[in-house]
Amino acid sequence: EIMKMPGHHKLFVVGELGRHYFVSQGHEIEQNFQYTVQKPNLSRARIISETLMEQFNNGELDEVYVVYTRMENSMVSEVETVKLLPLERSAFGEDSIPANLRREAIQLYPSVESVMDNIVPNYVTGMIYGCLVEAYASEHNARMTAMKSATDSAEAIIKDLSIAYNRAR
């Protein structure tokens, strides 16, 4: 859906399967992070986020979205799209703060810009790491479900063959 929106798009892909898919669909890939989904870690998330933050801060990217597979439950995985940059207040659930809660002004030292320059990269890294972990859990769950289904089918076939064998004796 995002790729169909008007404008110029840059595609950053994590993993070989995603790269194959987008290349086969005729999409040009800006950068392919050749990491396996099997071992998501914070250092990989940091490398990805630094690349995206650098291009966003240089004005090469207007918006940054992450599309990944989120595990809804043990049977269902959903495609999830999250807007990472620019940050929006609505993403932080300010509406969920109770109205009767006392609010005070927050003073940030040495400046708001300095604090945000430290917080935003960590937030983006954390979100990307969370997406990598969620995608890994989703893939692992899909494999486990497929293996259970294959095992159940094999057991049913063995049972049927055993009955047929015993009848033939």
Regions picked out by a protein language model, each given a short descriptive name:
Residues 1-169:
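C-terminal beta-strand-loop-alpha-helix "lid" module of Rossmann-like NAD(P)-dependent dehydrogenases
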